[in-house]
C-alpha cells in the first residue's frame, strides 16, 4: 500500500492495519526460524508497510499540534 493510499484512511483504520501487519510479521519470523518461509522478501515488505503507516500517523500527530 502506498503512502497516498494510507493517507486516505482514517487513523483508526491505519492502527488496525498496523496491528494485523505486526501479527503477520511475527508469523513470518516464526516461519523463517523453523525453515518454512519460502518468500523471505515478504518480511521486508511488511516491515516497510508498517513504517509507512506509522509515518502517516506521526505526520497527523505533528500537524494536529501545530
Curated annotation (Swiss-Prot):
Signal peptide location: none
InterPro entries to which the protein is assigned, alphabetical: Ribosomal_protein_uL29, Ribosomal_uL29, Ribosomal_uL29_CS, Ribosomal_uL29_sf
PROSITE patterns in the record: RIBOSOMAL_L29 (PS00579)
SUPFAM superfamilies per record: Ribosomal protein L29 (L29p)
Annotated GO MF terms: structural constituent of ribosome
Keywords, comma-separated and alphabetical: Ribonucleoprotein, Ribosomal protein
Single Gene Ontology BP annotation: translation
A matching Pfam family: Ribosomal_L29
GO annotations of cellular component type: cytosolic large ribosomal subunit
Record-stated family: Belongs to the universal ribosomal protein uL29 family.
Listed HAMAP family: Ribosomal_uL29 (MF_00374)
Stated name of the protein: Large ribosomal subunit protein uL29
Organism: Lysinibacillus sphaericus (strain C3-41)
Gene field: rpmC
